[in-house]
Amino acid sequence: MKNILKISISVALLSFGLNLSAAEDYSKLDVKKECDVKTNGVEKVIQTAEKYNKIAIEHGVEFMRFGMKNSQYIDASKEAIKSGAKEIELLDEKAKPTGEKVSIEFATWRACSFAISALTQEAQANK
C-alpha cells in the first residue's frame, strides 16, 4: 500500500513538473519562425496553429479578431486547402460572411500567429 502511495505521489509530482515546464516553453516560441508560410508551407503552419490553438482554448485564451475566433480561421483555412481555394471569406460575430476575403496564406499565418501569441502573452502575464 505504501508503494502505491509513493508511486502515485511521484507520478503526480512528475506530471506537475512537466506541465509547468511546458508552460514556460510558450514564452520562448518564435511566431515568425513557426508561422512562416513560405518556409514551412501552408499545411505545416495550419497544423502548428491547430496544435497551439487547442492549448489556448483549454487555457481560455483563444484570440478573436473582428468577431471571428481563431478556430474559425483554422477551419476556414483547412477547408480552403481541401477545396483548393485561394482565399477565405471573413465572418462576423454571428458567423455570417462579411464580404471581405483574404488569401489562404494570410489566413493561415494569422491563425498560427494568433494561437502562439495567445500562449506567449498568457505565459508573460503569469510571470
Question: What does each of the following model-derived ranges do?
Answer:
Residues 1-23:
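Classic N-terminal secretory signal peptides
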Residues 21-127:
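Long, charged/polar, soluble alpha-helical segments
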